[in-house]
């Protein structure tokens, strides 16, 4: 089921047939270089996909979605909205991970912008964040490009991160 569409991308629900594509993404060391847990095995990828297929028990409207390159209908990544608890508060992250052959084309920004708009307009969220490993300057740039600003450094169960955030802008009506 299609969730979002941009000029060059389609974001849709993940399906079991996405497993091999997701594994190709998750098993690539360069693509996963900023994830503290590193690459994932096929079984770990399968478990993560099953978790996303089942939906978050408290936030079923959130999750990661297959990211398809519209021109070729090729699976090029996974993006979406993820719930986190930070400092005792529930936050929603704009998350994005694209196949490295699609980097440096503005696709991360295009996906993140559409996801943020969806979060604000369709889900009526008032705040969105990005959690970024401090050396991941490409993700920092994506967050800044969609209007997020640096808020703080932090550490969670996965490791150290930079927290960027943005708030829903009041309607001009």
Feature map (PLM): residue ranges:
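Acyl-donor (CoA/ACP) binding surface of acyl/acetyltransferases
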Residues: 1-33, 50, 62-173
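Active-site rim helix/loop that mediates acceptor-substrate recognition in acyltransferases
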Residues: 41-60
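A short gly/proline-enriched turn/hairpin at secondary-structure junctions
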Residues: 32-40
């Amino acid at each position: 089921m299609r969730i979002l569409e941009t000029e060059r991308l389609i974001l849709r629900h993940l399906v079991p047939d996405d497993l091999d594509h997701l594994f190709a993404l998750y098993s690539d060391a360069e693509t996963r270089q900023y994830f503290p847990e590193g690459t994932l095995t096929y079984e770990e990828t399968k478990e993560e996909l099953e978790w996303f297929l089942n939906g978050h028990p408290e936030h079923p409207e959130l999750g990661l979605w297959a990211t398809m390159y519209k021109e070729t209908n090729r699976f090029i990544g996974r993006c979406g909205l993820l719930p986190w608890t930070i400092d005792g508060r529930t936050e929603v992250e704009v998350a994005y991970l694209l196949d490295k052959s699609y980097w440096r084309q503005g696709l991360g920004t295009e996906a993140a912008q559409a996801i943020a708009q969806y979060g604000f307009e369709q889900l009526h969220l008032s705040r969105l964040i990005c959690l970024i490993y401090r050396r991941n300057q490409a993700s920092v740039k994506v967050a800044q490009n969609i209007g997020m600003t640096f808020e703080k450094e932090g550490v969670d169960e996965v490791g150290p991160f930079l927290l960027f955030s943005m708030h829903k802008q009041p309607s001009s009506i």
